[in-house]
């Protein structure tokens, strides 16, 4: 393209680019298919490159002009900027060189570290081999020393030294004996000879120790027995030593058993304790066994370790089980336990009537047997706790010194310790719960629970039959103290046995008796009703048919009703006290969490029974209120609706001085309450007061619904409401105010000036009412209350929303 055309394009204001170049350039000639003209294409690209260069120069000049126009020292700044960029570039070059040097140094260090690590590893291997060689050399030296001294020690009867030599021989590394197989005769003859000498000496020493220990057992020489028993673990025959030593201890246990059984068959040493003869025998036997174990345990524990002590106890337990079998058979025969169990089971499960059973068990005899079983279980529990404390304790984990292997093997040591602990717990469970003593005591505890249930049942039934009023001025009868005494005695006896399951079973049976027998007896008396003048005629006719004096029958029924009412409330209170006392007493005893949860759940059953009795007492008070109070309150409140509420100021002032209704009404209520207060338990009287408060509020509210008020009538109503509140608060406390809270809302609505004020009062009462027992007036009820105001327009009341 000619130069003038380029010049004209550059000077024009059109933007330069490939498209303009193509547009102003010559159109390319059409070429044939699969042919390209690269010469023309290259020329166009060069042209565009030239245009871009000139544009760059123009832009740089424009930038320089702008900088010169806007800054005084534009050129100086450019130079400063250029120098700064140059310095930065120089610094970056220095950093790059330093980084290359650092990289090279790190590579060298890495190579050196790998070299050092390899050498350290080689040194560790060498150290391990050297230590192994030194250990092997030491073992070989010890092997020779043991072989040289073993025969002399046996000949001189220095069995302690001989046992030490054998122990060292048996604990040597097996690598020492593998040297015997090498072909070098000079290196193996000495080792082979030492091995044969020590193996032969071990057999001879084992026979000697067994023979000597057997002789000392036959002679009863305790010192010799304890001397030889210590050597069996050293020659790796601990079970043999325990078996032979247990022969001596089993002989002592058998002698102890025979002595105690002889005393038992002779009737004991104290005639006053014949009723607990078998419990005393078991206690003395376990105490003697504990002394035998305690005196011999230190020697065995030091020589055999805790794990072997448990195996040793299994050997002794066979003789203990045999004694307990004989004791249990004698106890079952002499105390007729199986016979009583059958009779008691028939009575409790109502297979036969209690009177129909021949030779029915005497509750006092059952009481003695139950106490003796508890004492027997207490002795067994004490013995098991002794065994668990002395033998069941776990060994402390000992971590060997060192860092490397110990850290790696710490988890393995913990796992081995856990497995040993689990195995030991299984053995302890086998010893404590699966032995004859354990299983038979569990069977006896089951028998005890059955006997205890029978004793409580018969005792409670006897307490009901012999129920009498305590004294002339008393509110309760003897059944309250008798039932609580029986239940407390049985629960504490079960707790004294040391078996938590028996405690839970006893509490369960006791609460079942309260909920059925005691509750049913009290409910029956309450359901007969309270005799008043209104129902006296029907009661008198019933008494006449039965041939009883009418007045005496009515008075007796009234007294029985009040006694049942007060007995229910008092018994509920005493059961709560019993529950709290048991919780406090058991809180000081250390028990597993499982047993604590069982006892906690059982004590809640006592609370539930107390709540049922309290509910029965409340029901009785309600029946008393319906019979003796409700109609009289209604009759006293009926004249209230006859008072004209369209009052004047003079009427209000007159009523303030001469109240025509409220004083007489409250005096009538007070006479009713005063008559019944001495007859009721405190909780029952409080319930009666609250029922009276609710009924007064209900009757007054019903009377108000039949009246029409003006402003002065509402003022008089407010005064009367305050009188009611003051009286009820005085006799029943602040809880009575909640019972008349709804009436207070009605009085507040009637004492407003306008409908708007009434709505404000209603909304405030809704916001301020926090008690769930006070029901706020609904909107329809508010309309009905405001309609009682004769001076309020009906249209305005209906428009309330």
Swiss-Prot record:
The membrane topology noted for this protein in its Swiss-Prot or TrEMBL record is:
Peripheral membrane protein
Q: Which UniProt keywords apply?
A: Golgi apparatus, Membrane, Protein transport, Transport
Q: Where in the cell is it found?
A: Golgi apparatus membrane
Record's GO cellular component, any one? Golgi transport complex
Q: Where is this region: Disordered?
A: 397-427
Question: Does the entry feature the keyword Transport, yes or no?
Answer: yes
Q: Where is this chain primarily localised?
A: Golgi
Q: Which GO terms describe its biological process?
A: Golgi organization; gonad morphogenesis; protein transport; regulation of cell migration; retrograde vesicle-mediated transport, Golgi to endoplasmic reticulum
Tagged with keyword Flavoprotein: no
Task: Write out the similarity annotation.
Answer: Belongs to the COG4 family.
What function is annotated for this protein?
Answer: Required for normal Golgi function.
Oligomeric state and interaction partners are given as: Component of the conserved oligomeric Golgi complex which is composed of eight different subunits and is required for normal Golgi morphology and localization.
Its name, as the record gives it, is Conserved oligomeric Golgi complex subunit 4
Record gene name: cogc-4
């Amino acid at each position: 393209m000619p130069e003038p055309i380029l010049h004209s394009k550059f000077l024009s204001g059109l933007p330069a680019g490939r498209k303009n170049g193509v547009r102003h350039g010559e159109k390319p000639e059409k070429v044939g298919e699969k042919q390209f003209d690269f010469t023309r294409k290259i020329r166009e690209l060069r042209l565009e490159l030239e245009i871009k260069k000139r544009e760059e120069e123009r832009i740089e000049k424009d930038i320089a002009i702008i900088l010169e126009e806007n800054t005084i020292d534009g050129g100086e700044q450019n130079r400063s900027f250029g120098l700064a960029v140059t310095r930065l570039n120089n610094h970056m070059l220095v950093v790059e060189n330093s980084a290359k040097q650092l990289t090279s140094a790190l590579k060298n260090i890495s190579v050196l570290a790998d070299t050092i690590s390899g050498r350290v590893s080689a040194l560790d291997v060498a150290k391990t081999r050297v230590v192994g060689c030194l250990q092997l050399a030491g073992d070989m030296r010890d092997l020779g020393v043991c072989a040289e001294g073993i025969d002399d020690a046996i000949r001189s009867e220095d069995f302690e030294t001989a046992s030490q030599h054998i122990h060292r021989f048996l604990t040597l590394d097996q690598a020492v004996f593998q040297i015997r197989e090498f072909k070098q005769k000079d290196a193996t003859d000495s080792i082979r000879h030492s091995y044969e000498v020590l193996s032969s000496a071990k057999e001879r020493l084992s026979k000697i120790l067994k023979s000597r220990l057997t002789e000392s057992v036959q002679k009863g020489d305790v010192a010799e027995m304890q001397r030889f028993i210590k050597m069996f673990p050293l020659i790796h025959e601990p079970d043999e030593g325990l078996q032979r030593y247990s022969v001596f201890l089993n002989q002592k246990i058998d002698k102890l058993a025979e002595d105690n059984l002889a005393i038992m068959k002779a009737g004991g040493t104290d005639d006053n304790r014949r009723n607990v003869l078998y419990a005393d025998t078991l206690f003395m036997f376990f105490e003697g066994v504990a002394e035998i174990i305690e005196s011999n345990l230190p020697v065995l524990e030091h020589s055999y370790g805790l794990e072997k002590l448990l195996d040793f106890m299994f050997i002794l337990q066979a003789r203990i089980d045999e004694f307990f079998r004989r004791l249990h058979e004698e106890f079952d025969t002499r105390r007729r336990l199986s016979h009583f169990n059958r009779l008691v089971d028939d009575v409790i499960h109502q297979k036969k009537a209690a009177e129909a059973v021949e030779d029915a068990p005497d509750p006092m005899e059952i009481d003695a047997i139950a106490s003796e079983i508890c004492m027997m279980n207490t002795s067994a529990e004490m013995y098991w706790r002794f065994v668990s404390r002395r033998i069941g304790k776990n060994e402390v984990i000992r971590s060997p010194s060192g860092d490397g292997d110990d850290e790696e093997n710490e988890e393995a040591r913990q796992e081995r310790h856990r497995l040993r602990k689990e195995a030991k717990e299984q053995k302890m469970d086998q010893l404590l719960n699966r032995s004859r003593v354990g299983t038979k005591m569990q069977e006896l505890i089951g028998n005890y629970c059955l006997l205890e249930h029978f004793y409580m049942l018969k005792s409670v039934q006897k307490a009901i039959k012999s129920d009498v009023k305590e004294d002339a001025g008393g509110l309760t009868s003897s059944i309250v103290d008798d039932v609580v005494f029986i239940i407390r005695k049985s629960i504490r006896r079960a707790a004294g046995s040391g078996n938590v399951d028996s405690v839970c079973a006893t509490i369960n049976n006791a609460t079942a008796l309260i909920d059925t027998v005691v509750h049913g007896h009290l409910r029956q008396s309450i359901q007969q009703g309270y005799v008043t003048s209104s129902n006296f005629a029907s009661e008198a006719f019933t008494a006449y048919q039965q041939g009883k004096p009418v007045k005496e029958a009515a008075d007796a029924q009234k007294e029985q009703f009040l006694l049942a009412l007060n007995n229910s409330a008092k018994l509920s209170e005493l059961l709560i006290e019993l529950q709290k006392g048991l919780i406090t007493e058991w809180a000081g005893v250390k028990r597993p969490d499982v047993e604590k949860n069982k006892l906690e759940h059982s004590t809640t059953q006592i609370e539930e029974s107390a709540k049922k009795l309290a509910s029965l007492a409340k029901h009785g008070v309600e029946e008393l209120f319906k019979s003796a109070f409700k109609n009289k309150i209604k009759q006293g409140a009926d004249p209230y609706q006859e008072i004209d509420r369209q009052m004047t100021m003079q009427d209000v002032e007159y009523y303030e001085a001469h109240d025509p209704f409220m004083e007489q009404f409250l005096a009538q209520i007070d006479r009713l309450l005063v008559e019944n207060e001495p007859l009721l338990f405190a909780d029952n009287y409080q319930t009666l007061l609250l029922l009276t408060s609710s009924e007064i509020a209900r009757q007054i509210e019903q009377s108000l619904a039949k009246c029409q008020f003006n402003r002065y009538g509402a003022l008089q109503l407010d005064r009367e409401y305050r009188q009611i509140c003051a009286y009820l608060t005085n006799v029943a406390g602040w809880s009575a105010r909640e019972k008349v809270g709804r009436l207070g809302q009605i009085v507040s609505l009637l004492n407003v000036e306008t409908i708007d004020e009434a709505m404000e009062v209603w909304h405030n009462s809704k916001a301020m009412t926090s008690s769930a027992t006070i029901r706020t007036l609904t909107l329809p009820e508010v309309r009905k209350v405001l309609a009682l105001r004769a001076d309020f327009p009906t249209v305005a009341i209906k428009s309330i929303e």
